[in-house]
Every structure is written in structure tokens, then in C-alpha cells.
Amino acid sequence: MSAQPVDIQIFGRALRVNCPPEQLDALNQAAEDLNQRLQDLKVRTRVTNTEQLVFIAALNVCHELAQERLKTRDYAANMEQRIRMLQQTIEQALLEQGRITERPGTSFE
């Protein structure tokens, strides 16, 4: 579906943005999250300039995103290593089983 104009409130300011209907709930949740972040920053930093608060919030979100990307990359590398180890273990077990069943003089029939 195509995006529809939607009105949201961010830190007391009305904004009209385009949003696909199926993403409206996510947009509203993001707006609530941003409002909370801005309010927390205002209290914590005592900065009253809205523009400055928005930039600080944007920097914080970018930093959090970078940290999550690092975590995801580390997790993926860890999983790849575990998969390789599991593959090696399986291959080794299959080789050993092949040696057991292929020994001369040993018949399991």
C-alpha cells in the first residue's frame, strides 16, 4: 500500500509525515519513544533549546544503533564459529564411524 499523510506530535510540535498504514503503530511507538527521550534529556541536561535536544537525541540514537550493529556482528561471527566447530565435529564423527564400519575382518551383517 502507499503511504498516507499522518499527523503526529513530537515534543509539543505537530508534524505531518507519510506512513504506510501497516506501519502506523510502529510510527506512533517511535514518536512516543522520541518524546520520552527528549523529555528525559531536557530534565537530565537542563537544556531548553528544542533543536539542541533533538540533535543530542539523534546522536544518542545513532550511538545506540552503532552499538547494536557491533553486537549483531559479534553474535553472527560467534555463531559462524560455532557452526564451523559443529560441522568439524560431525565430519570427524562420520570419519570415525566410517573407519569402524570399514575395518577389515569386522562384519556387522
Swiss-Prot record:
Pfam families assigned to the protein according to its UniProt record, in alphabetical order: ZapA
The organism's place on the tree of life at top rank: Bacteria
UniProt KW keywords: Cell cycle, Cell division, Coiled coil, Cytoplasm, Septation
Coiled-coil blocks: 21-99
SUPFAM superfamilies for this protein: Cell division protein ZapA-like
Chief localization: cytoplasm
Signal peptide: none
One GO cellular component term: plasma membrane
Single biological process term from Gene Ontology: FtsZ-dependent cytokinesis
Intracellular or extracellular location(s): Cytoplasm
Family recorded in the similarity comment: Belongs to the ZapA family. Type 1 subfamily.
Job description of the protein: Activator of cell division through the inhibition of FtsZ GTPase activity, therefore promoting FtsZ assembly into bundles of protofilaments necessary for the formation of the division Z ring. It is recruited early at mid-cell but it is not essential for cell division.
Subunit text: Homodimer. Interacts with FtsZ.
NCBIfam families: PRK10972.1
Name of the protein in its database record: Cell division protein ZapA
Organism: Edwardsiella ictaluri (strain 93-146)
